[in-house]
Amino acid sequence: MIEKMKVVHIVAAASEKTALLDRLRALGIVHFGEKASADQRHLERFTELSKMEMLLQEYTGQEPEKKLLSDKEFEVFYKDLAACMDRHKALQEQKTAVHAAAERLSEWGAFSPAELRSLGDQGLDIHIYRTDKKTAAALAADPDVRVIRLAPVGKMPTLASIGPLPAPYPVTEFPIPEKGLEELNREWEDCDRGIRVCEAELHDAARHLPSIHDQMLKTQNAAEYSAVSNTSQSQDGLVWLTGYIPAAEVEGFKKAAAQAHWAWAMEDPAADDDKVPTKVKYNKVTRLMIPVFDILGVVPGYREYDISFWFLGFFTLFFAMIIGDAGYGCLFLLAALVMTLKNKKASTAVQLLWLLSIATIVWGALTGTWFGLEQAMDVPLLKSLVIPTFANYPAHFGVESTTQQNTIMKFCFILGTVQLSLACVMNIRRKLGEKDLSWLADLGWLAAIDALYFVVLYLVIGQQVNLMPVACVVIAGFLLVVLFGGMSPDKTFGQGLKAGLGDAFTVFLNTISAFGNIMSYIRLFAVGMASLAIAQSFNNMAFGFKGPLVIAAILILLIGHGLNIVMGLLSVVVHGVRLNLLEFSGQLGMEWAGIAYDPFKKRDKIKK
């Protein structure tokens, strides 16, 4: 359920601004929609602390500190660590540059640039060149040029001359470096020693990661406090703030306001207010969807539906059909059991894993799929659990494979039709309550979708359907959508009719899209069959190995089924989630563009 919100305006004396902010943060129920930027110093410090935390994660291993550093102690630690990180970074960059210079110089061998420069001071302007064999021969034959032949460098003739060579000759001069190879190697070793010293300090500093996390939390809280402070407005000795509070918290706010002597005003959000936050109230069942919504980062709009219950139901079924293997479900169940026993309590995510595991086992048992093994049907107990027309090995039940495939596809289309029809019914119910005449358009969509289901069966499965009444229902639904789709409580009948007729072509395209939406549920069948085929392929590969090669067979099974599980989980995200977020939500008119309710309070966890 999406909780109702109230807009609240809070006014206090400007001299009481700090007390106002402190009390509001302690109250922890007011959401501020458009906050100003936090103070730059807090943002910069949080960024630096985040960099420290990320770097020190690479140096963990020692037992973490048991007592957090005090703020004063942490400041000393912070400055030392920042200096160490800067020194470590500079040494790494220097080491990389020295290594690159040494690589470039290595083919020239060990020599002393200082000695070459000293010769220059004595009047010997030595230049070193590389060139091709033809040019080298020409230079040697030129009586006006004096060159000394050196050992080839990089398989190219190398020459030395007193003074620069004449311009016409195509040669590449070797610039005398500042440091020789020996000096560079010594510098590289010095950098390496310095880096090891820094890394020892970083290993020791990693013990204080809990203190860094604590300071990150404090800094984030300070940043939010400053943002709310900067958001407040003041004039004539007064300071005020505007935010949102859940309707269920109104009495608690009134009590706090009376104690603090605030002036306040409260009202319902305006119809065009798109900054109203969404607070979803979950029950014991729907809260299982929280991990999925958190991963996807989606929040329903304030005026949209809370579809957590329906999302959970369909998502569970889609997950089971896409994974499709009871053996994999048993592995998921085992993982859920291990995590529950390890933590001595099942988190919301683990509880969801329990549900998905059981659903996968049930679906796999009904289709007779156990690690893709056809031999599983030789076990009487497992065979007795199978619905013959759903069986992935229909020959064991005297069912033709075409009949089995058509049955599964038909089941997928039924799921799609039911889910999309449910969306229409939900829209009708809401609009009837709002006295919105456009509910008739949703009734038209309901009729059209249910009729299009038979068109899908006719085209995909080849089922005999009387198309005349189906076409009549689709046309009737289309007309209802065109005539009443533009209606709304703030329009006259004529205005709504005009708007609906103006969208007639769009409605025509949307009707075709509705047909495609039902068709898209065939992905549940296709992905499930692909997963089964992959499992069977790896099984056949593994069973072909005999004798000492059994170890290779085991590796093939582990890698193959592991890969299949990973691909199945990715398919759940790509296909199972899509059907809920696009097809179902699209029919509901949901955009998932809500703003999560995020009240101003002192946090005990770092906000991502």
Predicted regions and their residues:
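Conserved, carboxylate-rich catalytic/transport cores that coordinate ions
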Residues: 1-6, 18-32, 251-608
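Long, charged N-terminal accessory/stalk domains
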Residues: 1-310, 339, 346-350
